């Protein structure tokens, strides 16, 4: 397909009439259609030519992301209510280890510090 594409790394790639570009700053291999505006990027393996979407839309624009989409065993974040007062519990993820789950207290701003006791098994 021909047409203007966004981004320098994937400027020559297009799929489904849309452009492909990195969806996460921390994971340049992760591509998504540029039309995805409010999305949650999953930590996935590199997909050649962005042949399939690897993001999911948020139901609300305000989302809580305690792990900041760090690489590792992070699960896709869930969208909080617009007030962001719901308590979200999910693993605090790092590169190679999984810490004990931490609670994100209202107003879903920052997670409590990650537990020093980490497990080596997958989350």
Curated annotation (Swiss-Prot):
Coiled coil spans: none
Region (11 X 5 AA repeats of C-C-[CDPQRWG]-[APRS]-[CIPSTVD]): 5-112
Keyword Cell cycle tagged: no
Source organism, top-level taxon: Eukaryota
InterPro entries in the cross-refs: KAP (IPR002494), KRTAP_type_2-like (IPR052154)
A GO cellular component annotation in the UniProt record: cytosol
Keyword list, A-Z: Keratin, Repeat
Its job: In the hair cortex, hair keratin intermediate filaments are embedded in an interfilamentous matrix, consisting of hair keratin-associated proteins (KRTAP), which are essential for the formation of a rigid and resistant hair shaft through their extensive disulfide bond cross-linking with abundant cysteine residues of hair keratins. The matrix proteins include the high-sulfur and high-glycine-tyrosine keratins.
Quaternary organization: Interacts with hair keratins.
PANTHER family, per database record: KERATIN-ASSOCIATED PROTEIN 2-1 (PTHR48425:SF1)
The name this protein goes by in its record: Keratin-associated protein 2-2
Organism per entry: Homo sapiens (Human)
């Amino acid at each position: 397909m021909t047409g203007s594409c966004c981004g320098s790394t994937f400027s020559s790639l297009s799929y489904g009439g849309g452009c492909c570009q990195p969806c996460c700053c921390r994971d340049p291999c992760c591509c998504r259609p540029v039309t995805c505006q409010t999305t949650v990027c999953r930590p996935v393996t590199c997909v050649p030519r962005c042949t399939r979407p690897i993001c999911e839309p948020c139901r609300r624009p305000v989302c809580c992301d305690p792990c900041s989409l760090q690489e590792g065993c992070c699960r896709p974040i869930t969208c909080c209510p617009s007030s962001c007062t719901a308590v979200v519990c999910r693993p605090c993820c790092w590169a190679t280890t999984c810490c004990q789950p931490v609670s994100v207290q209202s107003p879903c701003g920052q997670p409590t510090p990650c537990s020093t006791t980490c497990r080596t098994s997958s989350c």
